[in-house]
Amino acid sequence: MNENGATPVAAARRHRPLPAERATSNSNETGLLINVIRSLTSSVSEDQREVEKSRLEKGYKESGALIDRLVKNHQQDVEKCLVSFRDVSSKISNCRERIHNVRNALHTVKSLLELRRDDLKKLWHENAQQKSVCEIMAKLEELREAPSKIENLISKEQYQQAADTVTESRELINGRLSRVEGLSHLSAEIERFTKILIDKINDTLVNMLVVEPFEKHLLHIVRTIPEHRINQNAYCHSLSTKSRSGSGSVSSFSDVSAKSRIVSSVEALSTLFRTVEERHWDVDRLMMLGKNMIDKMIVNTVQVMKIGANIDESNEGDTTHLKQLMQLLSAQFDSASQQHAEFGVLVEKQLGRKDVVTSFWRSAQSAIEVVVSEHLDINPLLEKQNVLGTASRKQLFRFENTACATPNANSSSHRTKAVICKPSAYNIKVIFPILSRLMETTEKNINDSPCELRRFMHSFVMEVFVERVKGELASRIEGALRGGEAVRVSTNKKILPSCEKVLNLCKEVQDLIVSIDLYADRFAALWLLVLTDYFKNMTDVYDRMTPKNPDPSLPNSEALPTRRQKISAAWTADDDISRLLMSLPNWHAASISPMTPAVESELDVGERNKRESEILIGNLGTQAQNSLSESDLITDMNDIKMFASLHESLRWFSDEIRELVHSLPANVKMMLDTCMVQVRLKDGQMIDNNSVPSAIEDCVRRLESIADSCLLLLHIEIRVHCFFHLAPLAKYRNTSSHNEVDPEVVALGKDLHQFHDNLKDVLSPAKLSYVFDGLGHLCASLFIHYSQFMPRLTEAAKKRVCRNVWGVQQRLSRITNRRESDLDRARAFFDLLLDNTPDGILAIVPEKRSQFTATELNYLLALSVRSDKTLASQPGALEKRQMVLNSILNQKK
């Protein structure tokens, strides 16, 4: 550079090779020089060295000439470079001189500072001491004001600032001011306010975590209570005041102010307790305070509900109030759980504890157990067991009232129970669904199954309640079935009292199954016991009403009852006969269905009962003619009414039981379907490995079988009465009596009316129709059937038979409100005897063939021949005419 700072032109114009090119050029020149030196030193010949020397000299001269030419060509640039070099050299010299001067000045300063160092050090020490004294005095003043400052911050609920003040004061007392005498009073005062601060923080947390969630739900009740009742209770009055002031709404963590209070409180506790042990101790203490507050709030909740429902000593609550209480407690615990869940997140972050929610639900379970125990009347049972267990240990002294006795030494025995209704084990029905949801919520929150509350309820249900229900059911069913009024027919009701009582028991058990669905299998087993006992009892009742004939071959047959078995009972007990009769159309028509017509024609009724009449006449016709006696009949109308009531009661009972089973919830049905049971019946038969619904259905079907037997027995019995009264009409008798009909017809009509009067108010219309429909067809068939046993009939006897048929028809029509046209056929049968001789009967057979069967026409012809004075004594007269009749009938076919 020159003096003006400009860059030399020649230097700027010169071409500078690239670094790679310069490296290659230098490498080539160096290699050439080394080769020359090597050749000069290694050449042995002098001539060769001379040649090399001359070549080098030539090259040197050429290089010198080239340099001179270049210098000459760039003379101006060279001069500028030299000038620039001289300028730079002069500047460097000046800088070196100035640096030398600075070095000399620094040496001078150093020497001067070393001279004043001792004086400055002395002054610095004096200043530091003065500053330290001032700071100590300021800290002492701050420490003296710390108690009042802490108290002021506590009153403003600025817990974090108060905790910081406590920490700073402790650090001063235990640190810089530890050697200062006379601070013990201040230290004690600060510790006292520290305890107050901790208590205040814990109270605030308990209030936000427990009190406010509980009171939020109580405020809704308080708003509905009249003012004069609110003023009677201090707690209700305080809640009402909160409600009016608007401060009764529960704080939520979503609320910024509430969250800041919680965060401030937790951070304050974290500041106050430095060690993990101290923090855990305070969290445990906080949870214990929360547990005590839960117990207190439950008592307050019961008080508020009592006042709201106007419950006092003169007006007891019921299970509805208990259900409302448990629902309210469940809602309160849910609200408190939400608060604890969000509080637990802060505690885990600040204090390192993860069991806040778990601890809360443990306390909640304990509190719920107390409430449940007091309302289920569990404690008296436990106290009774304790009394029995400690009866042998008699106390010599009592210390409850001594001065050294603890305040809560006997609190458990004198604590007022927080109950809203009369304690009873059956209260579990209304509260178990709520408890079940609480148990599920608890297990979900504490991640433990089963929870303590579930174990408590399981112990109560399995060890106490099920056994109590079983014992009470046993005693109640004993009273329902063994009492004198159990099987006595009521005058204004068709259902037996025992049936209604047992059904009520079954409804109670079904209510238990639905309410306590987790133990549905246990209560369903009790249900089966009730049904089995009832089936055994009804079987005994039916057996007593239908005794069997004693077996003469038995040695103790004389000691057996002498009451004979009735024909209807024997036929009903016969499986083949009963199965046959129940397979007939009239039996199926007895059950009302949408396909059953409301009103049937006489033709339909006759067609339904035609086959039955044939069966009865075929089995009972000859016996009735020869050996049927009044002892074969049921003549006591109370028994008749009892059979009807038993049928209707058991049918009604079976339908109700099926409806109870059908109304069970789906989850209960699914549980019972997987529960297998074994049932022992009265006859020793076992219902083994059946599901509960199947076993119940089996018991119901067995009861229905008894009911069907009762109805079938009534159906057969009234027909046996017809056989009994109409069979004697076939015997010879004096026709000189002036009575229109024979006494047997009158007796039959009387029996039919008695049957109808006793059955019409008990049996349903369809069942009543089953009993009486077809009697006209049967009586008509009996008149015609017994005509084969009638002796010679005079004209008066013929008329008498016609009047008997008409008398039966008249009496039966009054009952059925139908003409009973089948008896018109019987009357027409005997009318043919009045108007025709045997040959005349043969003449009209083609006309009457459709009205009577071939057998009946044979009966008619035989009776006509027997009644004819001339033909009755002629040998072969009947056979000849029977051949003619058969010929006519064959031609008709």
From Swiss-Prot:
Protein's GO biological process: chemical synaptic transmission; exocytosis; Golgi to plasma membrane transport; protein transport; vesicle docking involved in exocytosis; vesicle tethering involved in exocytosis
InterPro entries: Sec8/EXOC4, Sec8_exocyst_N
Pfam families: Sec8_N
Tissues and organs where the protein is expressed, per its UniProt entry: Pseudocoelom.
GO cellular component: exocyst; growth cone membrane; synapse
Keywords from the UniProt entry: Exocytosis, Protein transport, Transport
The keyword Protein transport is annotated on this UniProt entry: yes
Annotated spans, Disordered: 1-27
TM helices/strands, residue ranges: none
Keyword Transport tagged: yes
Source organism, top-level taxon: Eukaryota
Subunit composition and interactions: The exocyst complex is composed of sec-3/exoc1, sec-5/exoc2, sec-6/exoc3, sec-8/exoc4, sec-10/exoc5, sec-15/exoc6, exo-70/exoc7 and exo-84/exoc8.
Reported function: Component of the exocyst complex involved in the docking of exocytic vesicles with fusion sites on the plasma membrane.
Protein family: Belongs to the SEC8 family.
Official protein name in the record: Exocyst complex component 4
Taxonomic lineage: Eukaryota, Metazoa, Ecdysozoa, Nematoda, Chromadorea
